Each structure stands twice: as structure tokens, then as C-alpha cells.
């Protein structure tokens, strides 16, 4: 039996969701099934949850936008932008599928799967509780400080960076079994993860310095235009550490897959959240959560990405 699990790629919550979901399916008697993992993204060159991916006897989509399909047998998500249109939401509701779960009040998809597994299926695995807890911290940015959020001295935070950089199909196929059978701390401290992190550490340091150089303070917003060179990744919390009094950040850069805008709310600013970032990003074809979101553009749309980023920064500046 083939079970295809399409989850959010290059994302610690996406990876952790795949681990929890696989463990839940094992508990439901499918331990002998072949699990095939697909890492989905929203960048121009990243795979989507298309029909061509849903080729299993069972198919799941996790931590990613809903896809109406008779082939889809399981669905878990917590993003407010899970449904690209009202038609998609209507299809979700009309399906009345007891294995479709959506709850935007959850701060991570991993926690949604863990709680649903316990309430609906009587499933819990104490060995995976550290993974659930940390995935929830990362996806909700519930760190004690912005400095902690960008500190990479903790092996688990180094693992987060590795997942965000390398998290494709092959990486998920390797890491999901590892995290199913080994403690999170052991996987994070493994030589394989350390070797993958080595080049990322220097890149992270350079990224912090470039953010410092390129940042513009626009009232309560920090705007960063980094489109002059190719970025390896877009860090979510660097501006909050560099500008602790900022309330929002808008960063635009060019990744391998094309331009991307990252928008976020600084939870350590001491100021209330007064905008729905997911709704703002959705207006431009992106999505996310009330406190963080992103928008991807085609490779030749750099100038439009820069224009949109400035529009959003102006809106959030009030």
C-alpha cells in the first residue's frame, strides 16, 4: 500500500507534521504501508499539491493549502489562508470527510495533529512530545526573546535551519524515519545534521550583517530591501533582534526560486497586533498567519515584489 504525504517543505512544522501524522497512521494499523513524502512550497519553482502528487492508495496534505480532490483522504492545516477561494472552502465543508481537519486557532499543524490524534483516535506518543512542543514554539515564535530566536548555539535550532534550507522530498524521506525512532535531541546533535549546518552558520552570520546594512526604519516598521543579490534564505526574526522597538518587519529578497516578501509582527515589541498579516499577504497571492506571512513572485517580477513590499510597509506604518 502506498501512502503519499504532501507536507509544507523547508519548514520545521511541515516536517514535524509529517512525523506525527506517520506515527498516527502506524497506530491505525498502517505500519507496513510505504510512505512517500512530498515537500510542497509556494515559490515559483517549488512543487504544489497538484493531482499528479496524489498518486497513493491514501493521500494526505499537511500544513499546506487545501486541494479539492477525490484522491485526498486526509487533511490537516491551521493557516487562515488554507483555502485559496470560497469555492475551495465550500468543497472542504461539503466533503464532510471525517479525516479532514482545519483549525486556524492552532499555532502549529503539528500540535493540531497531536491533539486531534488524542481526542479523535485515542493516540498519543510521549516520545514525540518534545518534537510537538518545539514545533509549536518555532511556528508561533514563542521564544523568550528575539535573540533566542536567532541564536544557533542550540542543536535543535541548528536543525531548524537545516530543515529550512534542505527540506525537500529526499530530506523528508530521511528525517521522518529518524525522528520517529530517535529522540529529537539525538537527531539534532547527529553528525549528519552538524555537517549540513556548517556552511549555513557562516551564511546566517552574513545574513544578519546584511539585514543590519539594508534596514530602513519607517515609523514602527523595519523595511529591508535585499534584492541586490541572491539570498539563500529569509530569516524571520533578525529585524526584531536588531530593532527591538519595531512592531512589524517587511523584508523583500531574491531566492533561488524567485523574489519573496516576508512580513512579520514583532511579539516582543510590547505593542498590540493591529493587522492581519495573512489577509494582507493574501491580497497579493500569498498567505500565512495573522502574525507572519509571505508572498512569492515569478523570477522576472523583482520590481513588482519591491513595489508590493513598500506598499505593505507603508500600510503597516499607519
Task: Enumerate the language-model features and the residues they cover.
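Glycine-rich, Lys/Arg-enriched anion-binding loops that position phosphate/diphosphate groups
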Residues: 140-233
Amino acid at each position: 500500500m502506498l501512502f503519499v504525504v504532501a507536507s509544507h517543505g523547508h519548514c520545521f512544522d511541515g516536517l514535524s507534521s509529517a512525523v506525527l501524522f506517520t506515527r498516527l497512521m502506524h497506530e491505525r494499523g498502517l505500519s507496513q504501508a510505504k510512505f512517500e513524502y512530498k515537500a510542497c512550497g509556494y515559490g515559483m519553482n517549488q512543487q504544489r499539491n497538484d493531482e499528479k502528487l496524489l498518486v497513493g492508495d491514501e493521500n494526505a496534505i499537511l500544513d499546506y493549502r487545501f486541494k479539492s480532490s477525490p484522491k485526498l483522504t486526509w487533511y490537516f492545516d491551521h493557516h487562515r489562508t488554507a483555502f485559496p477561494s470560497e469555492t475551495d472552502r465550500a468543497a472542504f465543508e461539503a466533503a464532510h470527510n471525517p479525516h479532514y481537519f482545519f483549525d486556524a486557532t492552532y499555532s502549529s499543524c503539528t500540535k493540531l495533529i497531536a491533539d486531534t490524534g488524542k481526542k479523535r483516535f485515542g493516540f498519543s506518543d510521549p516520545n514525540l512530545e518534545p518534537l510537538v512542543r518545539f514545533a509549536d514554539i518555532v511556528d508561533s515564535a514563542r521564544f523568550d526573546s528575539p535573540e533566542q530566536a536567532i541564536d544557533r548555539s542550540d542543536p535543535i535550532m541548528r536543525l531548524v535551519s537545516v530543515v529550512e534550507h534542505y527540506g525537500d522530498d529526499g530530506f523528508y524521506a530521511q528525517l521522518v524515519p529518524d525522528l520517529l525512532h530517535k529522540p529529537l535531541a539525538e537527531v539534532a546533535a547527529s553528525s549528519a545534521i552538524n555537517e549540513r549546518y556548517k556552511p549555513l552558520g557562516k551564511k546566517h552570520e552574513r545574513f544578519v550583517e546584511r539585514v543590519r546594512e539594508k534596514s530602513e526604519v519607517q515609523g514602527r516598521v523595519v523595511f529591508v530591501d535585499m534584492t541586490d543579490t541572491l539570498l539563500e534564505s529569509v530569516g524571520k526574526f533578525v529585524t526584531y533582534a536588531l530593532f527591538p522597538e519595531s512592531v512589524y518587519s517587511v523584508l523583500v529578497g531574491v531566492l533561488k526560486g524567485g523574489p519573496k516578501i516576508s512580513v512579520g509582527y514583532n511579539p516582543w515589541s510590547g505593542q498590540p497586533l493591529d493587522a492581519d498579516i495573512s489577509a494582507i499577504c493574501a491580497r497579493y497571492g500569498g498567505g500565512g498567519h495573522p502574525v507572519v506571512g509571505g508572498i512569492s513572485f515569478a523570477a522576472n517580477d523583482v520590481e513588482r515584489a519591491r513595489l508590493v513590499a513598500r506598499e505593505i510597509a507603508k500600510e503597516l506604518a499607519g
